[in-house]
Amino acid sequence: MSSKILFILHLPPPIHGAAMMGKYIQESELIDSSFDSYCINLATAGSLSDIGRTSFKKLLRYVLLLKHIYHVVRDIHPELVYITPNAGGKAFFKDFIVVQILKCMGYKVIVHYHNKGVSAYQSKWVYNFLFSR
């Protein structure tokens, strides 16, 4: 039996760099043949113009996302969770909560930042402190 891995990724739509990388991971035959893999879309934005904006609809999507992640990890008990969070802005804090919940539940978590936001936010003490968590 192969290892269970849960991938929590940004997937299109909307189409942007991190979402395309997530799609490549989701569709990888090598990953699929090597692991018992599951994917969850981390995105709460429905379009490019929705990125960076706050709305009740996105808040509701986020609450439903947290509930979905909880149920999936409880049902499949993955040996590893691979997540591609945002590296800055409000979305960083949204994704940070997901990572912390998974860690509190006892799961091994690999955090992979795809964008260049880490260098832009690393000089800010709050982000720098949270990056190390």
Regions found by a protein language model. Give the residues of each.
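Structural recognition of alpha->loop->beta junctions
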Residues: 127-133
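Glycine-rich, highly charged phosphate/nucleotide-binding loops
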Residues: 56-73
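N-terminal beta-loop-helix "entrance" segment that forms/cooperates
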Residues: 43-61
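N-terminal subdomain of nucleotide-sugar transferases
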Residues: 1-45, 76, 106-107
